[in-house]
Amino acid sequence: TAGSGHNLDASWESQSLPIGNGSLGANIMGSVEAERITFNEKTLWRGGPNTAKGADYYWNVNKQSAHLLDEIRKAFTEGDQKKAEMLTRQNFNSEVSYEADGENPFRFSSFTTMGEFYVETGLNMIGMSDYKRILSLDSAMAVVQFKKDRVAYQRNFFISYPANVMVVRFSADQSGKQNLVFSYAPNPLSTGSMVSDGNKGLVYTASLDNNGMKYVVRIQAETKGGTLSNADGKLTVKDADEVVFYITADTDYKINFDPDFKDPKTYIGVNPEETTKQWMNNAVAQGYTALFNQHYNDYATLFNRVRLNLNPAVKGVNLPTSQRLKNYRKGQPDYYLEELYYQFGRYLLIASSRPGNMPANLQGIWHNNVDGPWRVDYHNNINIQMNYWPACSTNLNECVLPLIDFIRTLVKPGEKTAQAYFGARGWTASISGNIFGFTTPLESQDMSWNFNPMAGPWLATHIWEYYDYTRDLKFLKETGYELIKSSADFAVDYLWHKPDGTYTA
């Protein structure tokens, strides 16, 4: 893991079960002794215009380099590539560091963890058998099962899109077997406080140290049998038959914000204390069964649209996925495994990209660190496009809408970038983006990756693809066409005539 030294354990990525609803994401580790759940809310980001140096420090970063284009193009046509390269390296970057420790305060931004949950079970591995972890792609539910001392234990995990709540149930086939201690470890680069919400709940309210972004995490437990106590920021359950934990979270980030280059709080517009309170009250009122039914019906409407059937599966259909992978690497054909991977990709997109929040980032929605590889940002040079290549073609058109909403927030800053660097109309983006409308190149002079002026037009192709599949003329008229046209304006102005009359970029 790149970046900060906090929490470098990579097991969450290679060994956990990922669940999500496009806003909340979690990774289920499944330990018998203490369940560990990494937790994310997709709009919790460091950086942006509200750091200590304010909006101008964040927005006023474009170099006025357009006047050099003619000189660079002339050098190219005369074969002086060294001069063209030098001018490009020196003038088509910015002073914005991509590394969190490269400037103070860090302004580019990074997706950051909302912390982790731990549930101590009072159990140990002695006498444990029949251990299983299951990720059901059909129901978007993670399950942990095992037996110990002739008791069958089960944990169920899902995150509901309609309710915006994560639901965690601990149960067993014998009564009085749940003895649990639930605790929360927040983002270490934030300042906050935990308070009790009655006897059953906890509320953690905090803000990130870097930019003051406010976030709230709410937890509530409901038990059958036994006792429940709430003290010192922990929920303690004794001798219960069943325990259901409801968890929700939000930040003060406003989806589809309209960038104001003078207002450092331009992206703020939500009260997470109120939103999380409403979600929690609604979830608890519904209860586990009703929430799961609602969750399943919502998810299945998307997932069940497509069935992939390749050649009849070879022997080994009932083997664990880990064993199937080992066999596959040895050259054994397994069409069912290929079908499974196809559907797993659809599952991950549904889990990380739903209307009403940001698009899937470099890690979808899952992250266990305060910083991460490539800031866990939006890489506009192919990665974000790759996330959405299978969206429409696998009948998940709705999952593209967060990407289109994200593109809309790039237009105003992207117009400034297009004008400053290329003297062009329209808008464009650069190599990396974030949730705060960043469209400028970074400080590196390595133009093999930092020079990416066609990022905007590439993003715009996804807008056309969405229309091409949906034939939603209302969308095209009200939203899509202007975004595409403005991107095309940039592309037209970016082209230039070589001396032989041919257009080139």
Give residue ranges: language-model regions.
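Aromatic-lined, polymer-binding surfaces characteristic
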Residues: 452, 494-505
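Aromatic-residue-lined binding/catalytic grooves and analogous aromatic/hydrophobic interfacial grooves
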Residues: 1-447, 465-467, 474-477, 481, ...
